[in-house]
A protein has these predicted regions:
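Glycine-enriched, solvent-exposed interface loops adjoining structured elements
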Residues: 1-132, 137-213
Length: 213
């Protein structure tokens, strides 16, 4: 769901004011008010990304489909392969090859100990169509998603959905999963307080954000 930046700023200010023990910031002098608004706006996308990166899947919205992937599979050995990730890829929602018996929701990183098993010459030791594994790696071409493994190289991509890094669009809107909105406002409030050297209050609001997920 797309939320307008001006409304997000307003809601973050309310969160900050509700957690202050002195004069609410909404009653501050105009120059300070404008500075606060700018500081909040500069932390909105950071707050959205932090929340979306840790939120459980049932709180996330549909996500974005990988675009142009139909002919973009690069095959390796033992029916494993890889695809290039979209430039704005932040988090995988779901990935499934057509001959897999179940999809992958969580990915490994290249420094994960389990990743070494994907280099085994024994296919059963790697991920299989019954127990597939995906790994996010860095290649000369860009970040990629390696998958292990398919039954044959005739397999195609059946599902590929991800959460992108957030951005403010040309109309002043930000795409935020609706069920994560309250957590985002508290996360942004916490980041702003930390930037203003209000460490204890900022840490408290960051914990409030996590508790809502």
């Amino acid at each position: 769901m797309v939320f307008q930046v001006k409304n997000i700023v307003r809601d973050v200010r309310l969160v900050i004011d509700q957690n202050r023990t002195d004069t609410p910031l909404l009653a501050s002098a105009e120059p300070n008010t404008l500075m606060l608004d700018e500081l909040i706006e500069s932390n909105i996308t950071k707050a959205v990304d932090r929340v979306h990166s840790i939120a459980p899947y049932h709180l996330l919205e549909q996500g974005h489909n990988f675009e142009g992937m139909s002919d973009a599979i690069y095959w390796g050995d033992l029916e494993s392969g890889w695809v290039l990730l979209p430039p704005d890829f932040m988090r995988l929602v779901i990935f499934r090859m057509s001959d897999w018996e179940r999809p992958v929701y969580n990915v490994l990183s290249a420094d994960d100990k389990l990743y070494k098993r994907m280099r085994s010459r024994v296919k059963a030791v790697r991920g299989t169509a019954q127990r597939p594994v995906c790994v996010v790696t860095q290649r000369p071409e860009g970040r990629s998603l390696e998958f292990y493994s398919c039954k044959s190289e005739e397999a195609t991509i059946a599902q590929a959905v991800y959460i992108p890094y957030s951005k403010i669009d040309n109309y002043g809107g930000v795409d935020i999963s609706e069920k994560c909105y309250d957590a985002v406002t508290r996360m942004a409030a916490g980041l702003v307080c930390l930037a203003l050297n209000e460490g204890e209050r900022g840490a408290s609001m960051l914990e409030m954000a996590k508790a809502l997920l």
